[in-house]
């Protein structure tokens, strides 16, 4: 399938590109060992995505994590998180473990964390929400500057973990998905507002290969 990403730009061991031809171009700035991402884009959802992606290729089983230090949204549904993606096409199968900018209720989600996935190219996205519903306190609240995200791959099983400095890694969800053994991984950001950019500060990115 032909990719509709703009030509990738090399950056500190990663490449970065706009996926899905968003109206506003995205950018990346290195700050120490972290990255500030700016992105436009309509959304990462339904059958096709628009976002900015800071990525590298990983093969086999792995464990990746990142801290979202701050998040300036352009919409209630602006999304920042870790992406695992089969291709750079806008309709690619993928998984994303993400945070929203605050703990406001959003449809089925009470809290700020969410896991979503697309099983086939051009298919609809699905989401895994926290089980807690209003008026209870959020089950997975954001806690900036310490909103941590972690993704682990073991074969076709993908596990998402959330953490703050208040508590250790907690399993958010597990999902089976048949993806290629070599995938694109890294921080991703979408504005959910085609005419206004969002900004997120990603820090403390780590990765390890599993044998």
Task: List the predicted regions and their residue ranges.
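Extracellular glycan-recognition regions
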Residues: 1-211
């Amino acid at each position: 399938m032909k990719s509709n990403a703009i030509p990738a730009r090399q950056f500190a061991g990663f490449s970065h590109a706009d996926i899905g031809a968003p109206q506003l171009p995205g950018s990346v700035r290195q700050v120490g060992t972290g990255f500030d991402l700016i992105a436009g884009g309509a959304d990462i959802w339904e059958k096709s995505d628009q976002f900015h992606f800071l990525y590298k290729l990983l093969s086999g089983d792995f464990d990746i994590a990142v801290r979202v230090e701050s998040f300036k949204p352009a919409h209630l549904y602006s999304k920042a998180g870790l992406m695992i993606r089969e291709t750079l096409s806008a309709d690619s199968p993928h998984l994303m473990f993400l945070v929203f900018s605050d703990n406001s209720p959003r449809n089925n989600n009470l809290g700020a964390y969410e896991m979503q996935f697309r099983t086939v190219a051009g298919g609809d996205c699905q989401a895994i929400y926290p089980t807690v519903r209003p008026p209870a306190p959020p089950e997975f609240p954001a806690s900036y500057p310490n909103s941590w995200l972690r993704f682990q791959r073991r074969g076709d099983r993908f596990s998402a973990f959330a953490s703050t400095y208040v508590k250790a890694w907690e399993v958010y969800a597990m999902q089976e998905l048949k993806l290629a053994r070599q995938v694109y991984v890294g921080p991703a950001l979408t504005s959910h507002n085609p005419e206004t950019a969002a900004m997120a500060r990603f820090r403390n990115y780590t990765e390890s290969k599993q044998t």
